[in-house]
Curated annotation (Swiss-Prot):
Taxonomic superkingdom: Bacteria
GO CC, any one term: plasma membrane
Subcellular location, principal: membrane
Compartments in which it is found: Cell membrane
Organism: Levilactobacillus brevis (strain ATCC 367 / BCRC 12310 / CIP 105137 / JCM 1170 / LMG 11437 / NCIMB 947 / NCTC 947) (Lactobacillus brevis)
Membrane topology: Single-pass membrane protein
Pfam families: UPF0154
Leader sequence segment: none
Transmembrane segments: 4-24
This protein's UniProt keywords: Cell membrane, Membrane, Transmembrane, Transmembrane helix
InterPro entries cross-referenced by the UniProt entry: UPF0154
Family as reported in the entry's similarity comment: Belongs to the UPF0154 family.
This protein's name: UPF0154 protein LVIS_1358
């Protein structure tokens, strides 16, 4: 076979693998987030109670806002 055919085959296979990997990773992350949702206010309240703090609604909102802001930065 000619060299250009091998190069074309390698490029096509590489693109197919990249597309398959992307969609596979996307599906995996969707399932992971469905099974393990991000932290919510109830979980944060329980965590604060375990640490011995009395969680006020203001403090909960403040911590949730800080966590969301940190998540956006990354």
């Amino acid at each position: 076979m000619a060299t250009w055919i091998w190069i074309l085959i390698v490029i096509v296979v590489g693109l197919a693998c990249a597309a398959g990997g992307f969609y596979g990773a996307r599906k995996y992350m969707e399932n992971y987030l469905k099974d393990n949702p991000p932290i919510n206010e109830d979980q944060l309240r329980a965590m604060m109670l375990q640490m011995g703090q009395k969680p006020s609604q203001r403090k909960l909102h403040q911590m949730m806002a800080a966590m969301q802001q940190n998540a956006r930065k990354k």
